Each structure stands twice: as C-alpha cells, then as structure tokens.
Amino acid sequence: MSTDTIKRYPMPMPFGWFAVSYSDELAPSESRAVHYFGQELVLFRTEAGKAVLMEAYCPHLGAHLGHGIHERSGTGGGRIEGNNIVCPFHSWKFNPEGECVEVPYAKNMPPKVAGKKCLKSFPI
C-alpha cells in the first residue's frame, strides 16, 4: 500500500488484538516510544515483569514518557521505578493503570490527578 493511500485512508482504531512488540524485545525496567493507531504511546515493562502500553504524554507539562533522559534512565527510554514509569521533566510517577501515584515535590496530590486515571492504558 502506498504512503499516499495510507494518508488518505488511515486505519481506524482497531477492534481486537494487534502485536506491537514481541515479549522478549522488552526487558524488565525497559521502555520505548512507539507510534500505533495514529498516536504516540509508551511501551514499558515493570521491574516485576508486567508489560504495559499507555498514552505517552505526561498530563502535567506534556513530556513524552517514552523518551526519557538518557543520563537518568540509562537506556534513553523512560525511567521505570518498581511498577511505575517516571516523567523525565518533574518525576511524576504513573502506575500501569495510568494513575498518578506520586508527585515528589507536593505535600498533597494535585486535584488534577488525585485519585484519577490520567493516562489511558491498553490491555496487553
């Protein structure tokens, strides 16, 4: 299929399962930026070994969670701490369900994220 055809007739959001990576391509505590279904996503594996696919942009200031900062993550991808992915800008932590579980410099969780699912996660 040509690039022009794909641009004119983009694939709609699929119903069903699609392979975005092989399991052995993602080690524990590793992440990578991926682009599927017309959107930027982050694919990561928790330290416990659970694979997670979720929206890529932090709701705070829009940092891409899959790019990270090389010096901090060691891989160039987003930093993983336990079961959470950490925003490279201000270290907000998100669990595999997309909930913000920590804002390190705040005494209380900001109302924008307190008890809310901030990022859409996709079943794997």
Spans of model-derived segments:
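Rieske [2Fe-2S] iron-sulfur-binding domain
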Residues: 22-124
